């Protein structure tokens, strides 16, 4: 069972947290206007995942505090 929580959607970029019992290190999924990738608690793509596009990076930087809070909330 997986639950999705949209953290932000801006300029075609979505950042979601998907929670399940076997989901690994805390992160959020980043989609739209670039590759499907993930962002970890350090603000960077998770190891082995694609780099952010310029548009994705702008949205992540602008919304970093709420993204980080969303990741922490769902991975307590």
Regions found by a protein language model. Give the residues of each.
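Catalytic toxin/effector domains delivered as secreted proteins or via bacterial secretion systems
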Residues: 1-76
């Amino acid at each position: 069972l997986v639950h999705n929580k949209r953290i932000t959607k801006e300029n075609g970029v979505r950042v979601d947290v998907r929670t399940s019992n076997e989901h690994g290190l805390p992160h959020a999924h980043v989609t739209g206007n670039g590759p499907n990738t993930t962002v970890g608690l350090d603000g960077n793509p998770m190891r082995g995942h694609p780099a952010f596009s310029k548009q994705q990076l702008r949205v992540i930087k602008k919304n970093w505090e709420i993204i980080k809070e969303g990741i922490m909330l769902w991975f307590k």
